[in-house]
Amino acid sequence: AGGRRSNVCALLHVTAAPIGREWWERWVGERVGACALSVRAFVTNARGFPVLPKETQAMVRDMFRKNIQIMLTDWNGGPDGLARETIAPGDVAGDEGRVDVDSAHPMRLYWEYLVYLFRGVEPASEQALAEAPYRDYLQAPLQPLMDNLESVTYETFEKDASKYIQYEEAVRCALLDLVREGDEGSVMVVGAGRGPLVRASLRASERANRNIKVYAVEKNPNAVVTLQHLVAKEGWGDRVQIFPGDMRTCAADVRVDVLVSELLGSFGDNELSPECLDGAQRFLKPTGVSVPQSYESFVAPIAAAKLHDAVVSYKDLKSIETPYVVKFHRVHHIAEPKSVWEFEHPNNAARIDNERYARVEWSSEELGSASSTLHGFAAYFDATLYDGPAGCVRCSIHPHNHTLGPTGELMFSWFPMFFPIQTPVHIDRRGDLPTKIEFYIWRRVDAHKMWYEWTIAKPVQGHIHNPNGRSYWIGL
């Protein structure tokens, strides 16, 4: 049957065939609602009990984490078709997970083994529990210049210790390299919000044994009031000066050693960091540095049926031509992320041009052996906060070098972005014919807004999404 069927889910049937990791990962991004796990998928261990091979164990644990129903099936030697007996862990568990199955039930040992695997799944961390409501939930990116952030948004950002640890270390290294001991250095925080980077900069100066003056620039009048209270409460009156206003037009007559900002978005430049920092770099001394110094944007093709279903459920063109911020959960990366472009600060070009264009290709060899469905592209950033003699400090949500916090948790200030495509594309890996994915993306800017346009050219030609910013844009 044709059409989209978001209310129809797949049932995976796992028999005796060995389960490869790539095969299972291919299904993570699809509409899988349940798994029929045949007793023939089990092997007997040295003690005579049924167990699953390691690859299948890993798959089952992942299904538990992703809330996929698992049903044991017993074919009793019958032909393939409907199982004669089925049993699901959720159907027969009593209080505290006790088993209420008759001890003589022929599938009891298999069921108990699944219970054992379920209990072995590590409990969700506090961070994972906090992020759970955002899993595969589409969020529109911020409009940082047009809108003032709400207090709850600031609070969420400020909870991410890992980000501010990285920023503090970057400022410390910059002060060591730029300010001689005994001299007074200067730091300007643009987009200071409620003050977390001001606090991080002051801590960095203490660790570097450098005296500094901090200038805080903030356009949100509510955040300015909070900053003023913070400065008074902490007794920073002689060390911190506040300039209310837009960093691009602020009249502060100062020149600083370090220009600090947390204007990065999930795709690096999507919250107008280039445009904002170009306007603020006039505050830097000729020898001054920006924190961050540079940031690189990446994209990767993904299978994400749940996300695509959510996008098309809005039934309008705007929704399919909008990139979203998403905490990925039921998503499969068809291939590895690749770089699209980079921005560096300060930008000393005679004519500053923040428009970008990239063509990215994934070859047949890079797509793996499992067929999949392309629903869109994941987007990430990797930033160099500071790189100098005193050290190199990075901040990243790239899957392979995601910044970690002090206890090993992932930095959570940014979720990845999702660029949907209007029509999903089947990536067929069954035959010998070569298959490749070719993706084009543009960053466009005019006097009033910034927007992205994107399309695919292979394996099929798609149309350009969001031409001239007709559906989505970020206001300047």
Model-assigned labels for residue ranges:
Residues 173:
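Pre-Walker A adenine-sensing motif
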Residues 1-163, 169, 177-183, 190, ...:
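Class I SAM-binding transferase module
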Residues 194:
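Conserved SAM/SAH-binding loop
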